[in-house]
Amino acid sequence: MESPTLLGLLLLLLGGPGTSLGEHRPDYDKEALLGGQDEVEEFSKLSPEEQQKRLKVIISRIDVDLDGFLTEAELSSWIQHSFKSYIIEDAKQQFQHYDKDGDGRVSWEEYNIQMYDRVIDFEEDTTLDDAEEESFRQLHLKDKKRFQKANKDGDSHLDFEEFAAFEHPEEADYMKEFVIQESLEEHDKDGDGFVSLQEFLGDYRRDPAAKEDPEWIVVEEDRFKNDYDKDKDGKLSPKELLTWVMPNNEGLAQEEAVHLLDEMDLDGDRRLSANEILENQDLFLNSEATDYGRQLHDKSFYHEEL
């Protein structure tokens, strides 16, 4: 089961429900953008001089060739770095919660206690009569299978690297086949090894009284046909499924870099100077380039000696 923090981040990166992959997400309030109420309060207490000082250090770290400008490639690379840093930090925080005995490993029992306050064990081949209980049993078994797959060395415990793969399988190459299979089990209703457009849309059926599909269906169909179905055969193969269930962080980062250039490049040279960024400080802070402002509170990003 993916952690809420990861789900939130992925929704931000993907633009949220009902948003096209190529469409930039709408504005979010300061609390969401800066990572929480504590971060908002801390940032509001900084003087304008301190805000700009921290921001300038981050700008200098993005500027790999030290020419005083940020290119699309430099912005994209930094955003990917920002994303990975967030994932590692999130996994570390989660790991501390799950590792109840502090031995540096997480057992299946510890995972259950943290998630459900008790150890749960369902029979894999038993179907429960109660629909809600059966739905929960299925989710629990999916968690168990993911835990077992992440347990690369088979010792029944997850070390930190394995736990990170369990929490964020999209970041672990050895989890790809499992994620594809998991997706097929969920969406491939006819068992043909592919996901059709109807299976992709799930249980949606147009209201007989409606003259046209709702906007979100139009958007999802467009994503299916133009972003995921590369060979245009009307269905998603296991390889094509990866672009849906395991989005390419490189592509997402490039989209954000292009967006920043489109919005902030005042002289049209397709690169950003420090002055252009400082003149659009709020936009830059509210982007993946600063992890929605979190980097201004993380010394590993803005401390000049690092």
From Swiss-Prot:
It comes from the Eukaryota. May bind phospholipase A2, since the rat reticulocalbin-2 has been isolated on the phospholipase complex taipoxin columns. Ca(2+) 1 binds at D99, D101, D103, R105, E110. The keyword Thylakoid does not apply. Ca(2+) 3 binds at D229, D231, D233, K235, E240. This is Reticulocalbin-2. InterPro entries: EF-hand-dom_pair (IPR011992), EF_Hand_1_Ca_BS (IPR018247), EF_hand_dom (IPR002048). Its main location: secreted. Residues 1-22 form the signal peptide. It holds the Pfam family EF-hand_5. Ca(2+) 2 binds at D188, D190, D192, E199. Expressed by the venom gland. One of its GO terms (cellular component) is extracellular region. It comes from Crotalus adamanteus. The lineage of its organism: Eukaryota, Metazoa, Chordata, Craniata, Vertebrata. The keyword Transport does not apply. Keywords: Calcium, Metal-binding, Repeat, Secreted, Signal. Ca(2+) 4 binds at D265, D267, D269, R271, E276. It is found in: Secreted. Belongs to the CREC family. GO terms for molecular function: calcium ion binding. Residues 50-85, 86-121, 144-173, 175-210, 226-251, 252-287 form the EF-hand domain.
